[in-house]
Amino acid sequence: MIKLENLTKQFVQKNGQTFNAVDNVNLNVPEGEMCVLLGPSGCGKTTTLKMINRLIAPSGGKIFINGEDTTDLDTVTLRRNIGYVIQQIGLFPNMTIEENITVVPRMLGWDKARCKERATELMAMVALDPKRFLNRYPKEMSGGQQQRIGVIRA
C-alpha cells in the first residue's frame, strides 16, 4: 500500500522565487493495485515518483509504504521493493525479455527456477505467451508489447 499525505515539492528558481512542482498531493494506492499518474507535461508526475523512491526529498508531507513512513528507510532496500514505469520503456536491449523481467529478483538472490516461474506468471498477466516471448529481445517486440514488459518488470 502506498499513501501520500500532503506531499509537496518546491524548487527555488534562479530569480529566487519558489515554484511548487507538487502541491499537497494526497493519494492512497491499495496493496496489489496499479496506479497511473496521468497529466500534462510539467504537472509533477515524475517529481512525485522521484519522491516516492527518494531520488529527491519532499519539501513537505509524508510517504507511507505498507503503513511505514519512508523517511528513515534505507534507500536501497526501499527501491528494491517498489517499482514504477515511466514513459520511456527502459528495457535492456542486450537482455532477453526473461532477463529483463528478472533483473531485480536475481539481485535479490532468487534461484533460476523461481525467476523463470515468476516471469512466466507475469507474462500471462499481460496476455503475452511466455513460450513465444521470454527468449526474445526487446527489438523483436512491438512498442506496446515492450511497454507491457516494462509494467510487469516494475
Predicted feature descriptions by range:
Residues 53:
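Helix-to-loop junction immediately C-terminal to a conserved catalytic motif
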Residues 98-106, 116, 120:
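Short helical segment in ABC ATPase nucleotide-binding domains corresponding to the A-loop/adjacent helical element
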Residues 136-141, 145:
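Conserved ABC ATPase signature
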Residues 69-83, 107, 112-113:
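ABC ATPase NBD coupling module
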Residues 151:
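Hydrophobic anchor residue at the start of the ABC signature
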Residues 62-64, 68:
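ATP-binding/catalytic-site motifs of ATP-hydrolyzing domains
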Residues 38-40:
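The feature captures the beta-strand-to-loop junction immediately N-terminal to the Walker
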